[in-house]
């Protein structure tokens, strides 16, 4: 009898790396997680040691094998999903990074982005890449490293250096330098990739003086990129055959294959992505246009809205205000609130994300009375997450012309039933919470498995990640719109207060 085969997903995140082994039913068999240090050289700067990331990945691969007793030879394929935009540049010969990885959150390259805006390149960048000019994306991070590491520009021009986002770095390491590749979803977040023509954009490269020689080859999200070097995978030469940035991987893991399907991941922040199909739709309302995934010779585009503060608002209640001891307590406290007062917490602790993009805004609270209780305040904080999601969903419907019928949800805060019910109420649509909340890793596993025939096709996946719970809207229309109107007033007042 032959041994059962599995798919391994490597989920490389901002604070930790994970390896998860899935079976053919999409069930998690084993997982391992390891955190790694965050580096803060100056206020607003965030960096990682790329070698520490690689070491953490090696550690969790071993951990998953130890936990499961599965052998490397039983892994049919590997899928990789990763923190997006984070930038590594390394020496092609030695494999050593020439500087720390600059993390997506880091603002150290903001002056480069500001200069591009001042020079009038906003429309050009938007039309070609679907993005806004921001330090968030990889392009300014590459330019910063080439400017600040002595001799780096010259070495890049000679072809001695390589650039990659974290997916590229991990594939290069796992294959022992045999493959220097990225995928559509990660390339689309560099601010260098023309998402319409599906190629690195010569005009933008010239504008930023970034040599094309350092860039990886861009591949689809589901194909064999290379095989693990045996000494990096405990003797196994296993195909690496699926890759996607974390939010796009979650879109795929949520089985959002049709235009108009939308998923939201309630993590530290909230990332809402809508599949818009094979037509690229540029947002006119401050959403990002990006590539969802490319598979079977087709590319599917997406609209994305990023909310900076979601689950971290609950952490603030716990660590900052000390109103709760654990995050799950927030639900019980909010349920105990008996007030109908319209209290609004606008958690703009680091500014407002989509669709406002106001980096000067700061947190505010409206509607407090002498009778306001801790329970009321916790409920208002939870509701702020749902209001922000509605801001993005309404904008997506305007941009796409698609009437959204359902929101598929995952992430830690999606386990909060009160939040999910209020989300359904304030949107007036169904909220479908996945039974398996490991949708990001599952998406990477699905992409890898499809490429090697482990799963036959998209239809064969649809029965694997069924809905765990459906939340249906129950609030009447006038109450819903009255509450949301109050939220819009609170956000407007918050922005006015932030004006200089």
Swiss-Prot record:
The modification Phosphohistidine is found at residue 232. Sn-glycerol 3-phosphate binds at residues 14, 84-85, 136, 246. Pathway: Polyol metabolism; glycerol degradation via glycerol kinase pathway; sn-glycerol 3-phosphate from glycerol: step 1/1. The phosphoenolpyruvate-dependent sugar phosphotransferase system (PTS), including enzyme I, and histidine-containing protein (HPr) are required for the phosphorylation, which leads to the activation of the enzyme. Keywords: ATP-binding, Glycerol metabolism, Kinase, Nucleotide-binding, Phosphoprotein, Transferase. Activated by phosphorylation and inhibited by fructose 1,6-bisphosphate (FBP). GO terms for molecular function: ATP binding; glycerol kinase activity. The keyword Kinase applies. Its EC number is 2.7.1.30. It catalyses: glycerol + ATP = sn-glycerol 3-phosphate + ADP + H(+). Belongs to the FGGY kinase family. This is Glycerol kinase. The lineage of its organism: Bacteria, Bacillati, Bacillota, Bacilli, Lactobacillales.
